[in-house]
Amino acid sequence: MNLQKFPRHPLTFGPTPIQPLKRLSQHLGGKVELYAKREDCNSGLAFGGNKTRKLEYLIPEAIAGGYDTLVSIGGIQSNQTRQVAAVAAHLGLKCVLVQENWVNYSDAVYDRVGNIEMSRILGADVRLDAAGFDIGIRPSWEQAMADVKQAGGKPFPIPAGCSEHPYGGLGFVGFAEEVRQQEKELGFRFDYIVVCSVTGSTQAGMVVGFAADGRARRVIGIDASATPEKTHAQILRIAQSTADLVELGQDITAEDVVLDTRYGGPEYGLPNEGTLEAIRLCARQEGMLTDPVYEGKSMHGMIERVRNGEFPAGSKVLYAHLGGVPALNAYSFLFRNG
């Protein structure tokens, strides 16, 4: 496997810490050891997150090509767009963000706090669009790029989640390599890795990276899209193309993409009672915050898999905390009583 042939522009602090979740592990019976890899603490750029790791492999192309405007898309409370806005500010580039109405959630401040507030503070041109949720290429995003061109700019396209970019999976191939190095220092290997999946390139990169040591199927994706067939297909497609890019030397099959579909409901961006219970439990056991859109759902999935005995006794499970906490303010009504 050859990740080193791809240029990388550092946007993160370096390897993210691995934190033992001792109290949560004991609360859930003590038979499974839980750990968290803190991608939510990976950068000083507007709280960072998993997209910042991905952007390290996209940005060299933008710089080398003389692009002057980063153009991205997401929901109103997109973490992706906030991270793109931060990177643009850091590099002295312009930024146009399309924020679509991906979530059927009504709150008076939903489009004024959290991620979108930060994007505006960072100087991005934020454009609200009424279109609903979809993980594919969006007409509104294509129109934003056309607008930049018409105004004389040179737009660099960054799709939702970085996932449709050919290099979107590379950052999390690097994540797997980073974990392997940390495992040497820890003196043990993780038996399972739990990660939230929506647009797919985070899990896809992990599948490729961990396939190098035989653990592709130990990457447990927890679907938060509530459109799991589309998400599974996109993860597989991205993983296969990423495997070719990094010269993995083995095929990635549909069976290598493990996606647990039980925790994504009722729909994208809307938590269920299990999501909210998991957010509170993790916060009160570990002081670690998760969000109702992504990490609360993957935390719920991990907790239930432990409770149900789906991880064998003695397993060491690594939870990939991808970020997402800046969206909490947009859901303040749900937590008005804690």
From Swiss-Prot:
Reaction equation(s) it catalyzes: 1-aminocyclopropane-1-carboxylate + H2O = 2-oxobutanoate + NH4(+)
SUPFAM superfamilies in the cross-refs: Tryptophan synthase beta subunit-like PLP-dependent enzymes (SSF53686)
Keyword Hydrolase set for record: yes
GO BP annotations listed: 1-aminocyclopropane-1-carboxylate metabolic process; amine catabolic process
Residue numbers of N6-(pyridoxal phosphate)lysine PTMs: K51
Matches recorded under PANTHER family: 1-AMINOCYCLOPROPANE-1-CARBOXYLATE DEAMINASE-RELATED (PTHR43780:SF2)
Family of the protein in this entry: Belongs to the ACC deaminase/D-cysteine desulfhydrase family.
Protein name, entry field: 1-aminocyclopropane-1-carboxylate deaminase
Biological source species: Acidovorax ebreus (strain TPSY) (Diaphorobacter sp. (strain TPSY))
